Amino acid sequence: MRIQPLIQIAVFDVADWEVDAEFGVFPQGARAKDAVFAPNPPPEPVITPGKRYLFKRSKRSYPDQFWGEVVAYRVGCLLGLQVPPAFAAWNSRTGYCAALIEWFYNDNNEAFVMAGDFLQKIHKDFDRKQGKQHNLLDNMHLLRTFAISKLLEPGWRQWWIDALLFDALIGNTDRHQDNWGFIFRRTEQDAPSRLAPLFDNGTSLGHERFTDRVDRWTEADYDRYVSKGTHQLKWSLSDPVQGHISLLQRALDEWPDTRKVAGARLNFSFDELSDAVADLARLAAVTPLTSERFEFMLRLLACRLELLRALF
């Protein structure tokens, strides 16, 4: 079930990579992004020559936030989930460090449509900026309609359970209506769409906590912090937001057939989890993944992993 991750040897420098003239500075989301094309030959075999990548920087307040995208990719691989490959990178001209994220669809024959575009048709007043109306029941209605009309490949219930499981493990609080969506094939009008890989995973892993302020945290402090984590979406329009674990539990109760696969995804040890990301802390980056940040991420992952296993 696990996916072998693409592992870089060194931090990639994109200073001489071609900037995408069509996309330029990518407008979607809160963090600055540039679209660039990988050179030929590529710096390492894990990079596909000529392919578009997103150079996604951190929020200014949290300069090492980009590491969350890279760690999340590795965690997704351990779970056996489709997450766009993410690498540590920088631009030697600007000095910016960022996550370098592989584009997850082929522009030549595919199109990506954000779920928010469809949800806005269900609720004409849907607030795309705040996303407070984003809820699972509306998502279910949309996906069921697509599936009945043969517009979507089967398996959407398992996809959502897996997404909630992944977000609960990494502590992602930002799976809003534009952070998931559909990939359509342009050349095959009658072909069903598929749900996109789990992209945009950087609002996670305690990125907003400064390591010098958590170095004395007790086990109770970690438990308290983890218990406050919530998903971005709600169960229904009238429900409040729920904690990472409780919303996943509710979805598992709704779709019991998804439980076996979801539980099997957690079949790894803490040592395997640590080993899956340990090499990142050894990369020589201008903004490194420090040992303090690395240990903090691991402690959070360990806490959440224990809570998730208790569900199965």
Where would I find each of the regions flagged by the language model?
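Conserved ATP-binding subdomain of kinase catalytic cores across diverse folds
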Residues: 4-127
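Aromatic-acidic/polar surface patches that form glycan- and anion
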Residues: 25, 64-68, 158-159, 290, ...
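Conserved kinase catalytic-core segment
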Residues: 64, 137-210
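Non-catalytic, well-ordered alpha-helical scaffold segments
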Residues: 70, 95-98, 158, 163, ...
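A broad, structural surface signal
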Residues: 70-78, 158-166, 299-306, 310
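ATP-dependent phospho-/nucleotidyl transfer catalytic cores
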Residues: 104-164, 280-282
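C-terminal catalytic region of ATP-dependent kinase domains
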Residues: 186-312
